[in-house]
Amino acid sequence: SKCWVNGYTVERFGKPGATLLNKGHRPFMQQKEFKDALAFAGDVVVIHLGVNDTDPRDWPNYRDFFIADYRALIDSFRVANPECRILIARLTPIADRHPRFESGTRDWHDEIQLAIETIAKYAQVQLIDFHAPLYPYPFMLPDAVHPDKEGAAVLAKTVYEA
């Protein structure tokens, strides 16, 4: 879906269930949406990946690749548009009613948050926070993971103000 904001064409290239990890169960970098995002060559790139990596098929087995895979993703966008501004987001919250919340997901989510903060520092990209603005409002995550329209508006505002 495409829209225009302050002279920018805004396009979404998300893939439901996609992982940042290239060895994950649905690697984003192997999806059509990734190729489309590179072809779009945006002036501003917002990356919010990692929530699906909390899957027990992924993080416990491949966590050691997360930072390198994220750096490769960032570098891909820099090749597509060397002048692009890249923002990477701290993960949206996972509500405690999520079925795997206490069986590893909560801890893995925290580990991924720390990895994203490390990546922002070393890849010299801007870190934005998708966690704090939604954390007080679990009702904006009706399935415990994905924001509803109101939650999406909060995230859009976060990006706009960055």
Please state what every model-predicted region is.
Residues 141-162:
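Histidine-centered active-site loop/cap adjacent to the catalytic His
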